[in-house]
């Protein structure tokens, strides 16, 4: 299927800046999203940790770059992952994005986080965030969006993820999410150190 998110003449995401050089787009995206992430907790707040919040986060971070920010992707995607030997994570089919997301978020919100100790919290939180991330609701920007959602959720529920996590360890975070999403026998230990190291009890 043709990827209609790309320009016709170059394999670069269509963007509001009309940048057709992949490296220049990556640089612009990095600069813009860095600034957006500085004040996102002031812009996206409240007690509802639902699918709309995830869409709002994506819209705020990427709205100056992509007209489809905050909208579900319209194509199925594959991404070769180094830590999987070039294989792809099995992301949600476009027809199942919303129901899978609603189910995953329901599971996340039903946990009684206050009764878990820090190691139990780290393990369960890692599994559930990995499940949400694996759905990959957007064409691009899923990791930054879901990790932002995760940091806000953890703050609200009495445990903390270091907000420098994404900025300072973005490659490791993505690799950990990839490994945690790798098939039926998911290797959550690759993701647990991320949460456990950066989780701090109040």
Language model segments and positions:
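N-terminal structured helix/loop subdomain that forms the ligand-binding/catalytic interface
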Residues: 1-72, 153-155, 159-162
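Hydrophobic (often cysteine-bearing) scaffold residues that line and stabilize catalytic clefts
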Residues: 50, 54, 121, 125, ...
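A glycine-rich, hydrophobic loop/mini-helix early in the fold
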Residues: 55-105
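Short alpha-helical scaffolding segments that buttress acidic/His motifs in well-ordered protein cores
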Residues: 57-62, 125-132, 173, 177
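Helix-hairpin-helix/helix-loop-helix acidic hairpins
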Residues: 91-136
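Short conserved catalytic/interaction loops centered on acidic-Pro-aromatic/His motifs
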Residues: 135-170, 185
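A structural-propensity feature for long, helix-poor, extended segments
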Residues: 180-182
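Conserved small/polar residues in nucleotide/adenosyl-binding loops
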Residues: 197-202
């Amino acid at each position: 299927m043709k990827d209609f998110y790309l320009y016709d003449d170059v394999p670069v995401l269509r963007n509001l800046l009309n940048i057709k050089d992949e490296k220049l787009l990556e640089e612009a995206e990095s600069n813009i999203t860095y600034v957006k992430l500085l004040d996102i907790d002031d812009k996206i707040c409240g007690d509802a940790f639902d699918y709309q919040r995830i869409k709002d986060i994506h819209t705020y971070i990427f709205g100056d770059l992509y007209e489809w920010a905050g909208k579900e992707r319209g194509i199925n995607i594959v991404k070769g992952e180094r830590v999987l030997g070039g294989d792809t994570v099995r992301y949600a089919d476009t027809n199942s994005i919303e129901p899978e997301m609603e189910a995953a978020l329901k599971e996340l919100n039903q946990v009684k986080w206050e009764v878990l100790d820090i190691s139990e919290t780290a393990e369960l939180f890692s599994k559930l965030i990995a499940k949400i991330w694996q759905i990959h609701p957007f064409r691009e920007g899923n990791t930054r969006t879901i990790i932002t959602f995760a940091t806000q959720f953890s703050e609200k529920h009495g445990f903390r993820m270091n907000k420098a996590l994404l900025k300072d360890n973005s490659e490791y975070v993505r690799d950990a999410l990839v490994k945690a999403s790798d098939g039926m026998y998911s290797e959550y230990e690759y993701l647990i150190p991320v949460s456990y190291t950066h989780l701090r009890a109040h």
